[in-house]
């Protein structure tokens, strides 16, 4: 372009107007191309600055071109669940919980991010979630904190839990005592697990019938909507491997749960190939704690970052809701027994009746009179004499 400009000047000085006229269009085209390139570069620089600005959830701590994960999570406050919710110095925690139940906040704080308290709204961001993390990553603590955050914000009249733990641990033992809990399988008893899955299927059908009978499209449009049901499954791969024939029932739950108020939280150590494509298509909320392989992290959140979380930060995780990925640190519950007691006290003060179990353990070989339930209304023909089992619940036969 510079050579063309010099030649044009020479032609003009020598008054060779014909040659100058021939050079002018070419010179003008080159100038326009240069201007276009400059504008494009400036536009790309502006977009780059916008994406990595202060309002972006992308981490801002870098060492060269790599995120300094240790510094990233070290800068996030590590506080207890009680302190996060202002309960650590509360002399009457149950009273605060009752107040929370009356407000019914949709969001639930479970930890701290770079910009403050990290909240999750399962109903709008989900309605289902997948949680992954290797041993020692803090997965159990995150599940407990998440469920406790739900329990202190929603009363047993509006929220129920079902817990299925297939690693034979004690993750949900304390949560079983919550007034919200309507079922818990905390061992490797497959017969008990089958009853739980049958009960979930029956509840799904019951809610479908309610919605159909009132000719509405969503459960919250019902005149008397049932409580939301959150089904938490730990070590999902064990359930899939041992009861593969029942996976279709959970696929239906994932497909229809949004409109019926039923939510699924699937937990595993390795997210690679653990969830059927039909179920995965309905899971839009992913939380990845530390994993051992970058492919596992990419599978869940679309980046390798979760595989680079230092082991010194249990509870550190990335949350991906389909649009953005946010790093956060989970706030672990310090005294779960005291908190569960406060929730039960709040339930008793509110006068709420604990929900009936959704399922029970299989019928024992022998039953005593203490296992029988007296009829609510005395009648000469209501004489309890045995226990009956319909494959889901055990009840007293009259």
Where are these regions (language model features)?
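P-loop NTPase catalytic phosphate-binding loop
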Residues: 1-49, 100-301, 307-310, 372-398
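Surface-exposed polar/charged interaction patches
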Residues: 12, 34, 44, 60, ...
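Membrane-proximal helical linkers
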Residues: 43-65
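Intrinsic disorder/low-complexity segments
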Residues: 54-55, 75, 257, 317
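Conserved P-loop NTPase motor module
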Residues: 65-107, 114-117, 125, 130, ...
């Amino acid at each position: 372009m510079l050579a063309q400009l010099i030649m044009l000047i020479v032609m003009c000085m020598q008054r060779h107007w014909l040659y100058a006229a021939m050079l002018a269009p070419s010179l003008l085209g080159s100038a326009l191309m240069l201007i276009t390139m400059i504008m494009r570069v400036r536009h790309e620089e502006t977009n780059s600055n916008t994406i990595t600005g202060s309002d972006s959830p992308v981490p801002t701590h870098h060492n060269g071109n790599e995120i300094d994960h240790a510094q990233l999570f070290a800068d996030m406050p590590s506080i207890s669940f009680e302190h996060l919710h202002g309960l650590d110095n509360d002399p009457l925690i149950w009273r605060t919980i009752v107040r929370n139940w009356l407000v019914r906040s949709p969001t639930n704080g479970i930890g701290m991010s770079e910009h403050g308290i990290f909240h999750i709204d399962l109903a709008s961001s989900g309605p289902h979630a997948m949680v992954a993390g290797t041993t020692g990553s803090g997965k159990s603590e995150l599940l407990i904190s998440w469920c406790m955050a739900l329990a202190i914000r929603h009363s047993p009249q509006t929220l129920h839990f079902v817990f299925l733990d297939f690693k034979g641990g004690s993750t949900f033992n304390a949560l079983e005592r919550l007034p919200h809990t309507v079922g818990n399988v905390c061992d490797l008893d497959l017969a008990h697990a089958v009853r739980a899955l049958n009960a979930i299927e029956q509840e799904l059908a019951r809610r479908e019938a309610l919605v159909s009978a009132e000719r509405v499209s969503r459960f919250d449009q019902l005149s008397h909507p049932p409580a939301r049901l959150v089904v938490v499954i730990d070590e999902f791969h064990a359930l899939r491997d041992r009861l593969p024939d029942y996976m279709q029932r959970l696929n239906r739950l994932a497909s229809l749960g949004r409109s019926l108020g039923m939510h699924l939280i699937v937990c595993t150590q390795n997210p690679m190939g653990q969830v059927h494509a039909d179920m995965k298509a309905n899971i839009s909320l992913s939380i990845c704690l530390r994993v051992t392989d970058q492919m596992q992290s990419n599978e869940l959140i679309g980046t390798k970052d979760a595989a680079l979380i230092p082991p010194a930060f249990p509870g550190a995780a990335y949350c991906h809701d389909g649009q953005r990925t946010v790093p956060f640190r989970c706030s672990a519950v310090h005294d779960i027994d005291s908190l569960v007691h406060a929730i039960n006290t709040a339930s008793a003060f509110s006068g709420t009746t604990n929900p009936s179990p959704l399922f029970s353990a299989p019928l024992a070989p022998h039953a005593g009179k203490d296992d029988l339930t007296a009829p609510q209304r005395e009648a000469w023909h209501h004489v309890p004499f045995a226990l009956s089992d319909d494959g889901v619940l055990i009840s007293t036969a009259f």
